[in-house]
């Protein structure tokens, strides 16, 4: 007979790497064309003026300018880039 108890197995011990999602450039910040504005899963925020959307729903600036968050209706948020700050 064994004198030591066999160690039991566990079904835990896994975790996925974080995906670094979220807002990368905030309202009023200056951006250049191609800068990533938001990394997201699904369209929590929709692209507005001068903002493109990648296949993974990443929003990025199409022109140099300033970031502005807006509400297109009661619920939906959009992000736009304008060449002037006002």
From Swiss-Prot:
Pfam families assigned: Ribosomal_L27 (PF01016)
Segments for region (Disordered): 1-27
Keyword Plastid found: yes
The keyword Ribonucleoprotein is annotated on this UniProt entry: yes
Alphabetical list of SUPFAM superfamilies matching this protein: Ribosomal L27 protein-like (SSF110324)
One annotated Gene Ontology cellular component of this protein: chloroplast
Name of the protein in its database record: Large ribosomal subunit protein bL27c
Organism: Porphyra purpurea (Red seaweed)
């Amino acid at each position: 007979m064994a004198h030591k108890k066999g160690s039991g197995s566990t079904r835990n011990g896994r975790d996925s790497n974080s995906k670094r999602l979220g807002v990368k450039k905030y309202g009023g910040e200056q951006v250049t064309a191609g800068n990533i504005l938001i990394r997201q899963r699904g369209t929590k925020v929709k692209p507005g003026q001068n903002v493109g959307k990648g296949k993974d729903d990443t929003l990025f600036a199409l022109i140099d300018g300033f970031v502005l968050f807006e509400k297109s209706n009661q619920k939906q948020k959009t992000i736009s880039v304008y060449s002037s700050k006002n």
